[in-house]
């Protein structure tokens, strides 16, 4: 028996003929992003405590879906990180300063969390998301220039990631729709 199974086998495994191409693509993407820094300016609070409380809450997935449809890059951060932000009066984690923190709707907001959100709000805009207002939240964030790319039109199935490396912008776009898409976007400094 072959234990563990060898998927790659130097690209010669007949069960996985395209595996060599997949690995080559992954290596290319990793090489391009190696040493880069993502420019993430939006954080979404993951409220595990709200999920455990038995009270009503909005899933982080709903907020994430709206942000993804609008090409707004974000980090999901745990509640604990608000208590240890690197800078008083704003949300800064791992050298990344967030312009906006989104708090998904929850029925109960603990006093400790409420105080932390108040402290963070001095330098980071804190927005409370509701299911009925997700589309307007996405539009608001786009209007603030927080999308990774400035598309000329709506492309809800395109996912975008922007990073900087060596003073240059790097973009990764991924189409999650089964059909091809032709997109146009504005890039600073280009006409």
Region locations from a protein language model:
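Carbohydrate-binding surfaces of carbohydrate-active enzymes
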Residues: 1-191
